[in-house]
């Protein structure tokens, strides 16, 4: 950890606890800050808040009183999930108090450089691929953020010869002040999180903050096939390295003659890649670009791609029952992810979809229903998905109350050789705590069929 003095004797407000808030508060206290912790949940039953209070921190729970800002606050470190429309944050902004997230704090103390990966879809897979390629290439990666350990905890232990690889959401990137990843990858942009950002434009600008502080000594990995990402890459002053699955990129990564190339050099044959789905070729090209820029050999990259079968809840193969293959794609929390999942198969598909209603319709899915023989919907968005399926002319359309019921119905509508796919196209929070919980319940329901 770098020697950092900027927080000493400063009054810092940590807004929202959870894992990242707890880690941020603990680190700030270690760095000599006067830490005030605020959480919307009541103190009763709030285990993390009670622990911080026991460590001598000032903990205020049960709401977000504006009076907290009267304590000469120098900095607000906020939980990524708390929107900037929160009255306390609005007031802090009016007072010109800097507002950051835990990742910014982690970067400020890290002795190791950062690789940051963002995009609407594919972040986790690309992050894991990058980590595995760097590990195979003996580049000493450590993984942080939404997967792995909280960034603050990783940064405290990271050494100069290591690389911090982190997946970054738009919520985290909105709080960028000085965060400067050595390599920043922007995978794609799709209309998502409009309940948080308001418009796709604002969502894209938040993502583009990953480039905000890059200089000509840094690298920006850009999806050349995504017009929105290409436009937002104008915010980068780093060296741009493009990747494409549709055309050759002279100074970037591309596919040619059934092989993946980087800057004109053949790296790996497509036939050596075991991870399914055309969309995953985009993720692989991005991860490969990062690995090559950091000096990983073609042999190490190939070794990873010959064995990497994917990330849990991302088009995860579950089992085969009576020649029906079940796949868990619970991480598909928006339409683009489901479009890519549907495009990964040529067999007839029985689709399970539905979840939290964020205000969007599902007509964009209609062109991807060509292999879908039946759909079973659940959750808040079930009626909207039914309307889209009717427009697509599907013959078999069902709505049920629970995911368990959806699995039973999906199996009943399947025949020999079908794929039964959970790819919800929606967030999970209407019925589940997380997409991971949703995926686990799907897997349990599938095994009950055996």
UniProtKB/Swiss-Prot annotation:
MF annotations from Gene Ontology: ATP binding; UDP-N-acetylmuramoylalanine-D-glutamate ligase activity
Keywords: ATP-binding, Cell cycle, Cell division, Cell shape, Cell wall biogenesis/degradation, Cytoplasm, Ligase, Nucleotide-binding, Peptidoglycan synthesis
GO BP annotations listed: cell division; cell wall organization; peptidoglycan biosynthetic process; regulation of cell shape
InterPro entries, sorted: Mur-like_cat_sf, Mur_ligase_C, Mur_ligase_C_dom_sf, Mur_ligase_cen, MurD
UniProt entry tagged with the keyword Phosphoprotein: no
EC number: 6.3.2.9
Top EC class for this record: ligase
Pathway: Cell wall biogenesis; peptidoglycan biosynthesis
Entry keyword annotation includes Lipid biosynthesis: no
Segments crossing the lipid bilayer: none
Binding site for ATP: 119-125
GO cellular component: cytoplasm
Catalytic function, reaction form: UDP-N-acetyl-alpha-D-muramoyl-L-alanine + D-glutamate + ATP = UDP-N-acetyl-alpha-D-muramoyl-L-alanyl-D-glutamate + ADP + phosphate + H(+)
Function: Cell wall formation. Catalyzes the addition of glutamate to the nucleotide precursor UDP-N-acetylmuramoyl-L-alanine (UMA).
Family matches, as NCBIfam families: murD
Family: Belongs to the MurCDEF family.
Name the UniProt record assigns to this protein: UDP-N-acetylmuramoylalanine--D-glutamate ligase
Organism of derivation: Bacillus mycoides (strain KBAB4)
């Amino acid at each position: 950890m770098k020697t950092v003095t900027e927080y000493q004797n400063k009054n810092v407000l940590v807004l929202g606890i959870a894992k990242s808030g707890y880690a941020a508060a603990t680190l700030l206290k270690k760095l000599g800050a006067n830490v005030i912790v605020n959480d919307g949940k009541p103190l009763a039953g709030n285990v993390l808040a009670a622990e911080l209070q026991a460590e001598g921190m000032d903990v205020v729970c049960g709401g977000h009183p504006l009076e907290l800002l009267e304590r000469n606050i120098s900095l607000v470190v906020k939980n990524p999930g708390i929107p900037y429309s929160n009255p306390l944050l609005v007031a802090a902004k009016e007072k010109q108090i800097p507002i950051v997230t835990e990742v910014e704090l982690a970067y400020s103390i890290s002795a190791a450089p950062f690789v940051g990966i963002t995009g609407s879809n594919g972040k986790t897979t690309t992050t894991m691929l990058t980590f595995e390629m760097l590990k195979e290439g003996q580049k000493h990666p450590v993984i942080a953020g939404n997967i792995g350990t909280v960034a603050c905890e990783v940064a405290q232990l990271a050494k100069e010869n290591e690389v911090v690889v982190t997946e970054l959401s738009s919520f985290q990137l909105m709080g960028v002040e000085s965060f400067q990843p050595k390599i920043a990858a922007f995978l794609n942009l799709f209309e998502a999180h409009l309940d948080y950002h308001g418009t796709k434009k604002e969502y894209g600008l938040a993502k583009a903050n990953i480039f905000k502080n890059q200089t000509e000594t840094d690298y920006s990995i850009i999806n050349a096939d995504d017009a929105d990402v290409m436009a937002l890459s104008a915010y980068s002053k780093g060296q741009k390295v493009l990747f494409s699955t549709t055309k050759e990129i002279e100074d970037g990564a591309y596919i040619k003659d059934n092989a993946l190339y980087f800057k004109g050099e053949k790296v790996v044959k497509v036939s050596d890649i075991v991870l399914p789905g055309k969309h995953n070729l985009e993720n692989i090209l991005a991860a490969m670009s990062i690995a090559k820029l950091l000096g990983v050999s073609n042999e190490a990259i190939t070794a990873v791609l010959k064995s990497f079968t994917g990330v849990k809840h991302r088009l995860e193969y579950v089992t085969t029952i009576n020649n029906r293959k079940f796949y868990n794609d619970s991480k598909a929390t928006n339409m683009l992810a489901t479009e890519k999942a549907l495009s990964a198969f040529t067999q007839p598909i029985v689709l399970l979809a539905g979840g939290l209603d964020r205000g969007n319709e599902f007509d964009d899915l209609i062109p991807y229903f060509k292999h879908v023989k039946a759909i079973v919907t659940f959750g808040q968005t079930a009626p909207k998905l039914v309307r889209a399926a009717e427009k697509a002319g599907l013959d078999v359309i069902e709505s049920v109350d629970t995911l368990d019921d959806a699995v039973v119905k999906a199996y009943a509508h399947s025949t020999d050789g079908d794929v039964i796919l959970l790819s919800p196209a929606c967030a999970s929070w209407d019925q589940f705590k997380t997409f991971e919980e949703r995926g686990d319940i799907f897997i349990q329901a599938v095994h009950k069929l055996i």
